[in-house]
A protein has these predicted regions:
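Active-site cores that bind ATP or allylic diphosphates and position pyrophosphate for catalysis
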Residues: 106-107, 111-267, 274, 288, ...
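N-terminal Rossmann-like or analogous alpha/beta NTP/dinucleotide-binding catalytic cores
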Residues: 2-128, 229-240, 301
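Active-site-adjacent bridging/hinge elements
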Residues: 2-5, 34, 207-210, 274-280
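Catalytic adenosine-cofactor/nucleotide-binding cores of aminoacyl-tRNA synthetases and other
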Residues: 241-386
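A generic structural motif
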Residues: 45-47, 215, 222, 353
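Catalytic cores of large soluble enzymes that bind and process phosphate-bearing ligands
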Residues: 51, 84-88, 104-107, 168, ...
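Alpha-helix initiation and N-capping motif
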Residues: 56, 89, 93, 112-115, ...
Length: 386
């Protein structure tokens, strides 16, 4: 175990926080607090085309409601800030230039139309087009590996659109270790040369993610299973920079109640239950999605339920306080396989917490619900308790 534990929850502000993302935040928080570490919130907003203006506020409100406070983040203890990637734009250019100088990255000028033509030609021949060592230097593609330095410089000065790609190694066997999934072996010849940076001055997720994790001294990257395919590239990037690699842990998916397929944001009210901690209003369509808070659920009940969706305490115990979760949690008991969501079990947890509440606590909660629903004439606490 590394001595200084620093973990991060790094959502993209593209909409409301899904309960799968909330569980990722929770596991990071529990791991940090169990090991006297630091829990960081970082907003990964490099994809401005998908940016939603009220999403960051929603994320922080949801974490507040669930009692998962971050130690560092936007507007709070900004020791390694800024914590929004859009505010770190100039920084990423410096680091991609380092990769170019080390011959670990290169300029590519291929248009979308040209790349589509290559894909169709490969498909016609029963093959799959991969932009990597197999074809990057054979003259079919337009990049700085086949162009002279003068030709490359001229294209950039003329304003030609470009991307900067990572130069994946050839004929290497990558041996990766995941805290949950164990040892993973990858043939580097199967990897494509991912885009790291674009001519509009914005990095892609991969570059920004690695640079920020390094500069923020992240010790453990605990994230969803959907990022497992990115792990080889991320480890290669750490190696290319000559940086120490953090420990990785990829959490299992939260599955739909029938056990088939990931429980997604789109499932929401369609399946008859919330998939967001708080109610969310889409600013463009005015569509309202229900939340657990507005549906009468207690935050501690929701957190208790989510903690057991993928983690096993090793006992028959099901009800945990937040302090109990912190003392019991460990990555060694997180499952590799997906965890099925159960609405009945979620209701059961809420009922257990309801029974524990005092009359005074219930009265306070009742008033909060009325205020949330903009009911103006509120009864007094004494009236409710009577």
């Amino acid at each position: 175990m590394k001595s200084n534990i620093r973990v991060r929850f790094a959502p993209s502000p593209t909409g409301p926080l899904h309960i799968g993302g909330l569980r990722t935040a929770l596991y990071n928080y529990l791991f940090a607090k169990k090991n006297n570490g630091v829990f960081i919130l970082r907003i990964e907003d490099t994809d401005q085309s998908r940016y939603v203006s009220n999403a960051e506020e929603y994320i922080t409100d949801a974490l507040d409601w669930c009692n998962i406070p971050f130690d560092e983040g936007p507007g709070k203890n900004e020791k390694f800030g800024p914590y929004r990637q859009s505010e770190r734009k100039e920084l990423y250019r410096e680091y991609v230039d380092i990769l170019i100088e080390k011959d670990k990255a290169y300029y590519a000028f291929d248009t979308s139309e040209e790349l589509n033509t290559h894909r169709k030609q490969h498909e016609a021949a029963g093959k799959t087009f991969i932009y990597n060592w197999h074809n990057r230097e054979k003259g079919r593609l337009k990049n700085s590996l086949v162009l002279t330095k003068e030709e490359t410089k001229k294209k950039i000065e003329e304003g030609s659109n470009y991307v900067i790609r990572f130069k994946s190694p050839q004929d290497e066997t990558l041996v990766l270790n995941d805290e949950i999934r164990g040892v993973i072996t990858i043939d580097s010849n199967t990897l494509d040369d991912k885009v790291l940076f674009k001519s509009d001055g914005m990095p892609t997720y991969h570059l920004a993610n690695i640079v920020d994790d390094h500069l923020m001294k992240i010790s453990h990257v605990i994230r969803g299973e959907e990022w497992l395919p990115s792990m080889p590239l991320h480890v290669l990037l750490y190696n290319a920079f000559g940086w120490e690699t953090p420990n990785f842990a990829h959490l299992p998916l939260i599955l739909k109640p029938e056990g088939k397929g990931k429980l997604s944001k789109r499932d929401g009210d369609k399946l008859g239950f919330p998939v967001f901690p708080l109610e969310y209003t889409n600013e463009q369509t005015s569509e309202v999605s229900t939340g657990y808070r507005e549906s009468g659920y207690f935050p501690d009940a929701l957190i208790n339920m989510l903690s057991l969706l993928g983690w096993n305490p090793g006992t028959e115990q099901e009800l945990f306080t937040l302090e109990g979760l912190i003392s019991s949690f460990g990555l060694s008991r997180v499952s590799k396989s997906g965890a099925r969501f159960s609405l009945d079990k979620t209701k059961w947890f809420n009922q257990q917490y309801l029974q524990k509440k005092t009359d005074e606590q219930l009265a306070e909660l009742y008033l909060t619900v009325l205020k949330t629903k903009n009911i103006q004439r509120l009864p007094s606490i004494d009236y409710i308790k009577s």
